[in-house]
Structures are given as structure tokens and as C-alpha cells.
From Swiss-Prot:
This is Ashwin. Residues 89-171, 205-226 are annotated as: Disordered. Keywords: Developmental protein, Nucleus. InterPro entries: Ashwin. GO terms for biological process: anterior/posterior pattern specification; convergent extension involved in gastrulation; embryonic morphogenesis; regulation of apoptotic process; Spemann organizer formation at the dorsal lip of the blastopore.
Length: 226
């Protein structure tokens, strides 16, 4: 191994000089820092600052020395294989890339908006329907019942209450065959039947409410203390 003389006049190895920058001269420190492109404008004449910069940026990191036995040789071979594998892998990934990497440079930020078509038609047709479709939709949403003009060849049974609460059915035929007086009578009968049907549950509910308190009173047992 080659040996060199430091600033203190001590014979040391070249590798040890890098680990002990205080033994190096100012010119050597400046040269080594300039080769590593480290700016040293503020510490040109100050060796202490140069040594601090060298320790911070240029001093090699400590590495473990493997023993000279079978295990050490095996680990050295593994380290070499790992380094070769990483180099080959990086070269293969760069060469086998299907497409170049995407770089966002600010110029490719303009995008266009695409409207997806539906099965029934374009989105514009769905947003702006034709007048026929709009009229059909309004008719379907707001159907107007017509009492005076029922459909022909169809009979509707009208419920009427009797003495025992039984319902009789009366057929209602076309409006052309029915006189206006009979039509008014039928309408009044329909209204009365609807009122009776609506009032019946209320009466039953009142009867049920009248029976419930008596049953609750019967269940209450008064406790007497001795």
C-alpha cells in the first residue's frame, strides 16, 4: 500500500487520509471538493471550515470489512451478484418499456369533454325531447278522469248499502242511453256509498276504544298493605 505524509508529518495510508481529513493539506481539500462540484467560496482560507465541508459532503461512509474465511468470501460473491442483477434489471426495464414515461410539462393540460351515448339515443335528445313526447308525458303524468263519458261495452258496479249493510250492484251503461236525471241519481248514490264506507271504520274504532278501558280496569288489581 502506498503511504503519504500528512500536514502533521505522520506516515499514514492513502485510504486513512480520507477518513481523517484533519491530516490533509488545504490544497488537497480544495482540490477534492472542487472535483465533487462542492462550492467552497466562503472557506477558501479557513482550513477548519474546509474540513467540516469535507466531512459533511465528501467523506466516504464506513463499510464493514468481511472476515477472510468461507462465509466472508460467500458474502462478497453475493454482493457482486446483487450489483450485477440490479444493473441488468434497470437496463431491461428502460429498454423494454412499451411507451415513454408521461411528462406533465404544462402544455398538455387542454382536454376535451366527450358525451357518452345512451341506448335510447343521444343525451341532447334526452334533455330536449320532441313536442309529441312532451305532450304524451304530460298526459300520462296528469290523467284527467271523465265522469260523463265512460268507455262503451264496459259496466261499472255501484255499491249501495241496505238494511243489513249488504251491497247491491247496479250497472252503469253508456251516457248516451242514460237520462240526465238518472245520471244525477247515480252520482249521488255513489257519493253516499263512499261516505258510508269512510265512516264505518271510525265507528268501529270508537267501539274498540270504548271496550279497551273497561278491560284495562278489570286487569288492575288494587294492592293493600297490612
Amino acid at each position: 500500500m502506498a503511504k503519504a505524509v500528512g500536514s502533521a508529518g505522520i506516515l499514514v495510508k492513502e485510504s486513512a487520509l480520507l477518513l481523517h481529513p484533519e491530516l490533509l493539506s488545504r490544497d488537497f481539500l480544495l482540490l477534492s471538493l472542487e472535483r465533487r462540484n462542492i462550492p467552497v467560496e466562503d472557506a477558501l482560507n479557513n482550513k477548519e471550515k474546509l474540513t467540516e465541508i469535507f466531512v459533511q459532503h465528501a467523506m466516504p461512509l464506513p463499510q464493514r470489512d468481511l472476515p477472510r474465511n468461507r462465509w466472508g468470501r460467500m458474502m462478497e460473491s453475493k454482493r457482486g451478484e446483487n450489483k450485477i442483477a440490479t444493473v441488468l434489471k434497470s437496463a431491461g426495464t428502460e429498454g423494454g418499456r412499451k411507451r415513454p414515461p408521461i411528462v406533465f410539462d404544462g402544455c398538455s393540460t387542454s382536454t376535451t369533454i366527450k358525451v357518452k351515448r345512451t341506448e335510447n339515443g343521444d343525451a341532447s335528445q334526452r334533455l330536449n325531447p320532441s313536442p309529441k313526447e312532451s305532450t304524451n308525458s304530460t298526459q300520462n303524468s296528469n290523467p284527467a278522469p271523465r265522469l260523463g263519458s265512460p268507455t262503451p261495452n264496459k259496466e261499472a258496479k255501484v255499491a249501495t248499502t241496505g238494511n243489513h249493510g249488504q251491497l247491491d250492484s247496479l250497472p252503469v251503461t253508456d251516457s248516451a242511453l242514460v237520462s240526465p236525471k238518472s245520471a244525477k241519481l247515480q252520482q249521488s248514490m255513489i257519493i253516499n256509498a263512499v261516505k258510508l264506507k269512510r265512516n264505518a271504520p271510525k265507528e268501529e274504532f270508537d267501539v274498540a276504544n270504548d271496550t279497551k278501558p273497561t278491560e284495562a280496569k278489570k286487569k288492575i288489581q288494587h294492592v293493600t298493605w297490612p
